[in-house]
Amino acid sequence: MKHLMSGNEATARGVYEAGIKVCSAYPGTPSTEILENLPQYGQEVYCEWAPNEKVATEVAYGASVAGSRAFCTMKMVGLNVAADPLFTAGYMGVNGAYVV
């Protein structure tokens, strides 16, 4: 069956179908709808709003180090705030999966 979705709705569906277990995000257009649409798929994905982009990145990265598949979303400018933990992630690697 075909469904008409926005790009953010399709991203949320892809996150669910990829088996992501932890999703952390900082709200801000245009990425807010991704986390807002995930709960419709049930309790299989833990979703959390973070106080800033750095914390959102650290939550998702921590879950991936612990072996979970994790997803972090934020607007592009937020990558400046999240740069420090992203650089660390590049050196340490993950045990699960980590998508930003």
What does each model-found stretch correspond to?
Residues H3-P39, E58:
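N-terminal glycine-rich anion-binding loops that anchor highly charged ligand groups
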Residues P30-V100:
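Thiamine diphosphate
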Residues K2, A10, A25, C47-P51, ...:
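Residue-level marker of alpha-helix boundaries and capping positions
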Residues M1, S6-E9, V65, D84:
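Residue-level detector of functional hotspots within protein domains
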